[in-house]
């Protein structure tokens, strides 16, 4: 079992409940999409799974470990086995792309190697290989602030590939890309995860991409799991219920003279 959540709740300091009674299991090597309306709790769930946020209640097990039962040092070692792809990668603007990719293994290297790599990239070939898979091999020595949003997202994915993470958590990893590039990137991420035996959980607003690229789809609504189904069994009724509020808003915005057309939001 790659990850397991039993009865997980998350309540923020202001009293807002982000997650409620989450029960979820992913086997090693599974590839799963997480969908739902804005504010459903997708990012909160990924942060709990990355052991960045401690749940208010319930049990979390990641890669055979209970993160909040570990010492701080052991928990940091566990995090080094987990790759988190951010919607907006937190990369220093003046940092070179090569350094951004190599940072994926800072938690796995001894301190001297991590410090040395910040001054002089020690594995340029490895970084280039990861970038080349995402058609960014020519950006190796560019500064991060010279890249587009979609390019920065692909750098974030290259970083996780270089990290060789056992568990990949991707939070809206292709939101800044056009549909063709987004599909190409998700296909590559799935192939890489399958080839390495890594578990992949990706949150997506683009429902069509989730259904096309992932064998299993989880719908999250108001902090709760609304459905957990094989992609082929996710029907219109399930999606209508998942996005009910957004559909109602779309209907109200439609002119009275035109029939209301409900579109499942893409991003």
Curated annotation (Swiss-Prot):
What reaction is this protein's catalytic activity? phosphonate(out) + ATP + H2O = phosphonate(in) + ADP + phosphate + H(+)
Q: Could you say which enzyme class this protein belongs to?
A: translocase
Pinpoint the ABC transporter domain residues: 3-247
Q: What is its EC number?
A: 7.3.2.2
Topological type in the membrane: Peripheral membrane protein
Asked if Translocase is a keyword of the record, the answer is yes
Complexes and interactors: The complex is composed of two ATP-binding proteins (PhnC), two transmembrane proteins (PhnE) and a solute-binding protein (PhnD).
GO molecular function terms attached to this record:
ABC-type phosphonate transporter activity; ATP binding; ATP hydrolysis activity
One Pfam family for this entry, by name? ABC_tran
Q: Its function?
A: Part of the ABC transporter complex PhnCDE involved in phosphonates import. Responsible for energy coupling to the transport system.
Q: What is this protein called?
A: Phosphonates import ATP-binding protein PhnC 2
Question: Per its UniProt record, what InterPro entries does this chain match?
Answer: AAA+_ATPase, ABC_transporter-like_ATP-bd, ABC_transporter-like_CS, MetN_ABC_transporter-like, P-loop_NTPase
Cellular localisation? Cell inner membrane
Gene Ontology CC annotation, any one: plasma membrane
Locate the residues binding ATP.
36-43
Q: Which SMART domains match?
A: AAA
Which family is annotated? Belongs to the ABC transporter superfamily. Phosphonates importer (TC 3.A.1.9.1) family.
What keywords sit in the KW lines?
ATP-binding, Cell inner membrane, Cell membrane, Membrane, Nucleotide-binding, Phosphonate transport, Translocase, Transport
């Amino acid at each position: 079992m790659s990850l397991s959540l039993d009865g997980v709740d998350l309540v923020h300091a202001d009293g807002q409940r982000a997650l409620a009674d989450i029960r979820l299991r992913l086997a090693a090597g599974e590839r799963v999409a997480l969908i739902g309306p804005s504010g459903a709790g997708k990012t909160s769930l990924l942060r709990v799974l990355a052991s960045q946020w401690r749940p208010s209640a319930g049990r979390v097990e990641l890669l055979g470990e209970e993160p909040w039962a570990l010492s701080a040092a052991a928990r940091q070692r566990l995090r080094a086995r987990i790759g988190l792809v951010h919607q907006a990668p937190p990369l220093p603007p003046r940092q070179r792309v090569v350094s951004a990719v190599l940072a994926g293994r800072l938690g796995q290297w001894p301190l001297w190697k991590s410090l040395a790599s910040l001054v002089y990239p020690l594995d340029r070939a490895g970084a280039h290989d990861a970038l080349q898979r995402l058609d960014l091999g020519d950006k190796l020595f560019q500064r991060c602030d010279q890249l587009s949003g979609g390019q920065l997202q692909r750098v974030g994915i290259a970083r996780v590939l270089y990290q060789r993470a056992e568990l990949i958590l991707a939070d809206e990893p292709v939101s800044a890309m056009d549909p063709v590039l987004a599909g190409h990137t998700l296909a590559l991420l799935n192939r890489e995860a399958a080839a390495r035996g890594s578990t992949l959980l990706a949150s997506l607003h683009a429902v069509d991409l989730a259904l096309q690229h992932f064998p299993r789809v989880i719908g999250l609504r108001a902090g709760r799991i609304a459905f957990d189904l094989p992609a082929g069994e996710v029907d219109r009724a399930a999606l209508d219920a998942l996005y009910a509020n957004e559909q109602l808003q779309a209907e109200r915005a439609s002119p009275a003279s035109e029939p209301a057309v409900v579109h499942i939001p893409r991003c």
